[in-house]
Amino acid sequence: MSMIKLLKNTLKDPKKIMRALEFAPSFVFGKIYLSIFGINPLKVHNFGKIHIRKYDSSTIIIKSGILLRDVEIAARGNGKIIIGENFHCEPYVRLNVFEEGILEIGDNCGIGSFSIINATKKITIGSNVLISSHVHIIDGDHGFKKGELIRNQKMVSEPIEIGDDVWIGTGVKILKGVKIGEGAVIGAGSVVTRDIPPYSVAVGVPARVIKKRE
């Protein structure tokens, strides 16, 4: 059934109208919201609320086959967000870029609930990457030189690169300047502060390689 026929049939039945209105805040308004920000709503399957904040000269590019649930996507300054095909995002995920920051996510990636990605410099995530829930990927932190309030100091940022086919476990924190090689696995609760070689399994605080994938 075409969208036009569906709408006509719905408008003829008051009960159908009431049911449609119940879902309007999450589904219909989500489609309208995407359209306002220049994103083709037909490319996105949305469930729940979608918050997109696009400021100044920022750019948000979303490819096809995307599944979003209660997600917040925000691009500030001249920031850029590029999301590849078949991206699945669980509820309460936040994707943020600041200033000149860039966030690039490859194809066939998934992010679990309550995860946060903040890019001030550049965060690159390859294809076929699995990111579990409550993961934080942040490419910057505050300067903390003595003699000046930390809150007044500039951010110190370094790019993060995550290769293809990486699995990041629940509650992992990935900090600035880190490169995680293709096929690596990061165990739950780890804090990644240094590079992880390809096809390595790393765990702990800070994360250390304990073995290679076989």
Curated annotation (Swiss-Prot):
Superkingdom in the source lineage: Archaea
Q: Which organism is it from?
A: Methanocaldococcus jannaschii (strain ATCC 43067 / DSM 2661 / JAL-1 / JCM 10045 / NBRC 100440) (Methanococcus jannaschii)
The yes or no answer to whether the keyword Transferase is present is: yes
Query: What Enzyme Commission number(s) apply to this enzyme?
Result: 2.3.1.-
Q: What InterPro entries does the database record attribute to this sequence?
A: Hexapep (IPR001451), Hexapep_transf_CS (IPR018357), Hexapeptide_acetyltransf (IPR051159), Trimer_LpxA-like_sf (IPR011004)
Lineage runs: Archaea, Methanobacteriati, Methanobacteriota, Methanomada group, Methanococci
Name recorded for this polypeptide: Uncharacterized acetyltransferase MJ1064
Keyword Acyltransferase listed: yes
- Transmembrane stretches, by residue range? none
What keywords is this UniProt entry annotated with?
A: Acyltransferase, Repeat, Transferase
Alphabetical list of SUPFAM superfamilies matching this protein: Trimeric LpxA-like enzymes
What are the GO MF terms of this UniProt record?
Answer: acyltransferase activity
Name the family the entry cites: Belongs to the transferase hexapeptide repeat family.
Question: Pfam families of this UniProt entry?
Answer: Hexapep
